[in-house]
Amino acid sequence: IVGLPNVGKSTLFNCLSSAKAQAANFPFCTIEPNLGVITVPDERLNKLAEIVHPGRIVPATCEIVDIAGLVKGASKGEGLGNKFLVDPLEDKSVIDTELQLKDLETIESQLTKQKKTAAAGNKDAKTMVTVLEAYKAVLEQGKNARGVTFETKEEQKVAHDLFLLTTKPVLYVANVDEASAKTGNEYSKKVEEIAKEEGAECMVIAAKTEEDIASLETDEDKLMFLEELGLEESGVNRLIKKAYALLNLETFITAGEMEVKAWTYHKGWKAPQCAG
């Protein structure tokens, strides 16, 4: 989870995981990232359990990281001014810029060394230089690296292993008030438009309301709360499913007397790969 301070990141993180991160209305309330484990909702597990009657149900899980709130200048270790006006597009621009600068720093730290090695005839270094320079050219234009594609498997592997921040797939989450939880508002519409232009996913969620829902003890109470808002499913569940799909992850299920268990695999894997 990446975003500016005061936008509901830690509240959202708390809803997604069992951990309780500090949700403070000031910058850098967290310096180190918060780590949590979330369960992937899957209605099939309970249905299978009704048939098999296992000793336990084990859902699929994945890790989630709440990065300390980014601010303009964060890539240089700078702090935050006093600007708290709501402008999601400006927020996005700040985040993009900071991540791009960090990626450029990563690239430039390697490029000089790799050029020297490539000049000596090293084939792998030449591939690395090709990839680094392609990314550098795009980032210097103020664009994210995820738009860069490579033709050869060697280049693709090098690109993957760089783990640049702006190559990662994006799901934009627009945090709104309770009244806008179903349809969004003028601000979330702006985010949806820019996400569509980028071919990215976008969704609306009311993080504070989700926190209230998560605090309810029974599923019946949660369902009643959602019905009052005109929602069929919690925003948290929708978010987890969207993120799971965005990462090209799917699950298969094994069922027996001991347990009904969901296993995570990458979309496109064949059975031997899934079996490990």
PLM region spans:
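Switch/coupling subdomain of P-loop NTPase systems
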Residues: 86-109, 181, 189-202
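Conserved G1/Walker A P-loop phosphate-binding module
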Residues: 1-92, 96, 107-108, 113-117
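C-terminal-of-GTPase-core extension/linker across diverse P-loop GTPases
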Residues: 1-2, 7, 13, 113-276
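Generic alpha-helical segment signature
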Residues: 41, 88, 100-103, 125-128, ...
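Flexible, active-site-adjacent loop/turn segments at secondary-structure boundaries
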Residues: 21-29, 43-50, 55-56, 68-69, ...
